[in-house]
């Protein structure tokens, strides 16, 4: 029986053009650039003027071009997201439609910030079954939709964006070599949007509002523990030492979490690719965006051993060891882009900020 692997042959990202800076946030929140940077490492984040599926499509188009794979060759699409345009149907089918793919398996996957690692594991195993040849794995989020812009602790953290990779079937030992995904359900309520879904009263007067539960200190402890243990497990299973890991692509949630993860794993911090300063926490999109930029910036070389680690609501966690293939140079490039946005980030958010603050005043 042939042993198949799933090599990453293409990579792409899509970040909205509109930037929301820390200074912008300080115009309507009790915060400052220094306060945010020293606690999170974040300087800017992007605010989308389009739907999640639009960003996912552009990221996929760039990944396809760089892989040299035609859309018609794709037979599997997985979109990791917790902020889809619609619940029914899934947005993987919308991406499929946008790309002009007539027939492919297409589904969404919600594991919050760990979603891309879950998707990478799922896509790899399906390709290894021998039933699929090329897959698009996407992490895409429009988290600005959920944010209570009157709550400083969460409003400063999140942003919008999408990243994608193409997985291609090969007999070379490359791609995902070891992975571990899991969930610590005892802590599911400390990071949640609890009243969004069928549990909400759809006829309530204020059903346009919902809480974003975020217990920062507890999340920090569980994130470091979950990602750290998973990282050690996959390193041991792959029979690699920390010295043999060339690049770490961590979930970009907080610079302190990234630094602590490296310290606990015994991996030098300079091996970790960090771009949280530019985009904030884009949930399932952080890992593929970081992976794409690491390749673009020359941080990834042919044959490199890579460690991916993520943690998210649920509380989901995961880590993976990847071996990069022989190519870091794109086969082609795409000119795909989002439509221009003539509004600033503050203009895009003006109504949401106003209504969130009115709600808080009414509660007092």
Curated annotation (Swiss-Prot):
Give the reactions, separated by semicolons, that this protein catalyses. malonyl-[ACP] + acetyl-CoA + H(+) = 3-oxobutanoyl-[ACP] + CO2 + CoA
Give the span(s) annotated as ACP-binding.
252-256
Query: Active site at which residues?
Result: 113, 251, 281
The enzyme's main class, written as a single word, is transferase
Q: Which GO terms describe its cellular component?
A: cytoplasm
The record's keywords, sorted A to Z, are: Acyltransferase, Cytoplasm, Fatty acid biosynthesis, Fatty acid metabolism, Lipid biosynthesis, Lipid metabolism, Multifunctional enzyme, Transferase
Query: In its UniProt record, which GO terms are filed under biological process?
Result: fatty acid biosynthetic process
Q: What is its EC number?
A: 2.3.1.180
Functionally, this protein is described as follows: Catalyzes the condensation reaction of fatty acid synthesis by the addition to an acyl acceptor of two carbons from malonyl-ACP. Catalyzes the first condensation reaction which initiates fatty acid synthesis and may therefore play a role in governing the total rate of fatty acid production. Possesses both acetoacetyl-ACP synthase and acetyl transacylase activities. Its substrate specificity determines the biosynthesis of branched-chain and/or straight-chain of fatty acids.
Q: Which family does it belong to?
A: Belongs to the thiolase-like superfamily. FabH family.
Q: What is known of its domains?
A: The last Arg residue of the ACP-binding site is essential for the weak association between ACP/AcpP and FabH.
Subunit comment:
Homodimer.
Recorded hits in NCBIfam families, A to Z, give: fabH, PRK09352.1
Protein's UniProt name? Beta-ketoacyl-[acyl-carrier-protein] synthase III 2
What organism is recorded for this protein?
Answer: Vibrio parahaemolyticus serotype O3:K6 (strain RIMD 2210633)
